[in-house]
Design a protein with these regions (language model features):
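C-terminal ends of transmembrane alpha-helices
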Residues: 113-119
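N-terminal, motif-rich segments that launch catalysis or mediate targeting to/interaction with membranes
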Residues: 1-101, 119-201, 206-214, 221, ...
Length: 304
């Protein structure tokens, strides 16, 4: 891929939501795939902003889950479908910036259920959820290497051809990830991970999640392609030379942003660990997303 792509992936992207959305662009296929890739890379700020908006702006946390063992409780498929429609409308109008933003938002709802902890709910998971996500973010480069070197590379992923194709795709992601839910709980080492997040995950976790990363990236690429086809417009040619220069100049700023976010993650995990050691549970220091999902799950599933 291009220098610009590498700069985005390795320096600008601060979360796995960012990385998966950008990685999907490299897997695009079709006659106009290079144009679409370059266009969305040029609109990377909107794409990455959208990819985190469900967490930072909308905070509609029920839409971030799909619990396969509870009759597919959660709103991820419907949320993804809503933002697919917005993406297609924006592309039809040639509003490339908003189209990229919508693509980022949609990607969040698609890939969240491919994280096993977004497919179920247990007390044990709540204790380590934030720590596991921190560890998986920090070990992404290693898991990417495992995918390419040991697991056969990017997988073949296909979409259904009916009206519910996107909802079925989101459900397929949850079905693929949920079998690893218990493995993450049993194998994650909180004592190690709270200090050095890369050490919290063992080889089996890394191998399984590497496969999920591959599925998520290619699934997103196929979804983007379907949206491009539905929009039925030709993307403009763009030159990324100036954009590459600007991103390169901003690398120090991006690294500072990464360091700040890492410090915030560490503080969150440390607080949860301290509460767990003191009380045997995690309640007061749960993240807002976990608190909301836990409350809604109790009201809508456990008490139903």
């Amino acid at each position: 891929m291009s220098v610009f792509f590498d700069l985005l992936l390795n320096t600008v992207c601060r979360s796995n939501h960012h990385r998966l959305a950008v990685e999907a662009l490299a897997q695009l296929q079709g006659n106009d795939s290079e144009r679409w890739r370059d266009l969305f890379l040029q609109q990377y700020e909107a794409l990455l902003e959208g990819a985190k908006a469900p967490d930072t702006v909308f905070k509609d946390f029920k839409n971030h889950v799909l619990h396969t063992r509870d009759n597919y409780w959660g709103g991820a498929p419907e949320a993804a479908e809503e933002w697919r429609k917005r993406m297609v409308r924006a592309l039809k109008d040639r509003d490339w910036k908003y189209g990229a933003y919508c693509a980022g938002v949609m990607s969040h709802y698609v890939v969240d259920p491919i994280q096993p902890f977004h497919t179920g709910q247990t007390e044990e998971e709540g204790v380590i959820h934030a720590a596991v996500e921190w560890s998986l973010s920090k070990t992404y480069p290693e898991m990417r290497k495992i995918l390419l070197a040991d697991l056969g590379g990017w997988p073949d992923v296909r979409l259904a051809d009916d009206a519910d194709w996107l909802k079925k795709a989101v459900r397929a992601g949850a079905d693929r990830s949920n079998p690893h839910y218990d493995l993450l709980i049993q194998h994650y080492n909180l004592e190690l991970g709270r200090k050095k997040p890369e050490q919290g995950v063992d080889q089996e976790i890394k191998d399984k999640v590497a496969g999920l990363i591959g599925f998520a990236v290619v699934l997103l690429a196929r979804i983007f392609e379907r949206c491009f086809a539905e929009a039925a417009v030709q993307p403009p040619r763009v030159n990324l030379a100036v954009d590459t220069l600007l991103v390169g100049l901003n690398v120090p700023v991006a690294m500072v942003a990464k360091a700040i976010e890492n410090a915030q993650d560490r503080a969150q995990v440390t607080a949860m660990y301290q509460e767990f050691r003191k009380t045997g549970k995690v309640r007061q220091t749960l993240r807002d997303d976990d608190k909301e999902v836990r409350a809604l799950y109790a009201a809508e599933v456990l008490k139903a």
